[in-house]
Amino acid sequence: MNNNATHNAPNLRTLAEGVLQPLGYEVLDVQVQNPGRRPIVVIRMDRLDEQPVTVEDLETASRAVGAEFDRVDPIAGEYRLELESPGAKRPLTRARHYERMLGLKARVRGDGHSFTAPIKAVDGEQVTFDVGGEDVTLTVGTFQGNLAEFPDRHR
């Protein structure tokens, strides 16, 4: 294994995106868990066509990312690679993610804010939340957002 490798999630994300985007997938989040021992690289992904992620999608993505990580060798020593669908705590990282989840509650942290509130509107990169009857508008990329409730249907 590569002795100069790093557990740098942004570098791993870049590698994963380069492999998954041409296959029709979007990387939502990359985390390196248990970095002091045998690291676990967790990649949360979605389909670019916004259809539900299937087991077959996860298998395809896992094989493709695994092959690229084997080729590039970005992590020193042994590690475990896990790919998963967004799930109930879906990361919201782009304006279109908020648009897709309009009306649902999001958990927001950063930019001096910490709240859970419904997504009220999206205008370009501006997302407006209904926080206790008051509008709070934030710019995508200046805060972290996750879906705080599971939609009753696929969006």
Curated annotation (Swiss-Prot):
Keywords on record: Cytoplasm, Ribosome biogenesis
GO BP annotation list: ribosomal small subunit assembly; translation
CC per GO annotation: cytosol
InterPro entries registered for this protein in UniProt: Ribosome_maturation_RimP, RimP_C, RimP_N, RimP_N_sf
Subcellular location(s) of the protein: Cytoplasm
Pfam families named in the record: DUF150_C (PF17384), RimP_N (PF02576)
Record's keyword annotation contains RNA-binding: no
Its biological purpose: Required for maturation of 30S ribosomal subunits.
HAMAP family for this protein: RimP
Family according to the record: Belongs to the RimP family.
Designated name of the protein: Ribosome maturation factor RimP
Source organism per UniProt: Deinococcus geothermalis (strain DSM 11300 / CIP 105573 / AG-3a)
Lineage: Bacteria, Thermotogati, Deinococcota, Deinococci, Deinococcales
Gene name, Swiss-Prot/TrEMBL: rimP
